[in-house]
């Protein structure tokens, strides 16, 4: 089976085709970063309009690159939520229209479940029947803890199986990726600037700026980054504008974030008595975070699974992949009514088993 995946939840238009046996056949991503950079953040109306302009050409180009025609596609998967409602509606409308025209089922995919499963993308999905997903056992054992870190979410999730999720903790205010981008703007790096901030931090002097590590000593697994954001912005506003000082602030900020995330992960792994950790989402590309978590997992004889760097940010490949899993589990839909969920809890998803 082959599934076309369509991702339009925020400011990336992602298209991909995933084959049950051959793996990922093609994937293309168009980022709206330049469009939104002048505003210092995503403008929802502009995002939706740009998806409208880009989604069809990307689909046509992807099918052409993979040497596929419409009859080669067995289902269409799209991001149904969570996300920006206007952006979501673009992908949903196109997906349902194609499913109707091609007479194939449609699958509305949860954006964060797709991120959660992204680290498995570099493996072919070998399915012996609708309830035997042997490849996942080869990659990582259930249960595991997932750290989902992106521009819109910061969550620690207990994963008992695909579709069986328990949110252990999440940010009570700003998502960590959002804070990275906001601090980057104040550092003069523009939007989106999270990756540039990390590059700047590499030449910063460790220890010159020490910022609070929010909620690491509090019970539970929730996060809070608004106080850290305020502390860093104040440091930027009160400091000299030289490049080294900016790099030192970036270094202190990044270290505070990474330490906070790693402490919460460690506590969750210990309390849940789990040895496997998955990280995904845009911030999972952060080199310092990967290194810190890798050392932590080695110290407890655990295993860390990360996405390939090109799949950390939003993309259609993760949507197609997740759609295929749910299609094989019999969870597709012939009802072509256009449905999106700007707010949608992982815990409400049905299990594939």
Swiss-Prot record:
Subcellular location: Cytoplasm
UniProt cofactor(s): Fe(2+)
Residues holding Fe cation: 111, 115, 314
Binding residues for substrate: 148-152, 181, 194, 286
Entries under SUPFAM superfamilies matching the protein: Actin-like ATPase domain
Broad class of enzyme this protein falls into: transferase
Protein family per UniProt: Belongs to the KAE1 / TsaD family.
PANTHER family named in the record: TRNA N6-ADENOSINE THREONYLCARBAMOYLTRANSFERASE, TRNA N6-ADENOSINE THREONYLCARBAMOYLTRANSFERASE, MITOCHONDRIAL
GO biological process, any: tRNA threonylcarbamoyladenosine modification
PROSITE patterns: GLYCOPROTEASE
Keywords: Acyltransferase, Cytoplasm, Iron, Metal-binding, Transferase, tRNA processing
Cellular component annotations (GO), alphabetically ordered: cytoplasm
The keyword tRNA processing belongs to this UniProt entry's keyword annotation: yes
Catalytic activity, EC: 2.3.1.234
A Pfam family: TsaD
Cysteines paired by S-S bonds: none
Superkingdom of the source species: Bacteria
Name of this chain's protein: tRNA N6-adenosine threonylcarbamoyltransferase
InterPro entries: ATPase_NBD (IPR043129), Gcp-like_dom (IPR000905), KAE1/TsaD (IPR017861), Peptidase_M22_CS (IPR017860), TsaD (IPR022450)
Coarse class of the protein's main subcellular location: cytoplasm
HAMAP family per record: TsaD (MF_01445)
Protein function: Required for the formation of a threonylcarbamoyl group on adenosine at position 37 (t(6)A37) in tRNAs that read codons beginning with adenine. Is involved in the transfer of the threonylcarbamoyl moiety of threonylcarbamoyl-AMP (TC-AMP) to the N6 group of A37, together with TsaE and TsaB. TsaD likely plays a direct catalytic role in this reaction.
Catalytic reaction(s) noted: L-threonylcarbamoyladenylate + adenosine(37) in tRNA = N(6)-L-threonylcarbamoyladenosine(37) in tRNA + AMP + H(+)
Organism encoding this protein: Blochmanniella floridana
The keyword Metal-binding is assigned to this record: yes
GO molecular function terms noted in the UniProt entry: iron ion binding; N(6)-L-threonylcarbamoyladenine synthase activity
Textual note on the cofactor: Binds 1 Fe(2+) ion per subunit.
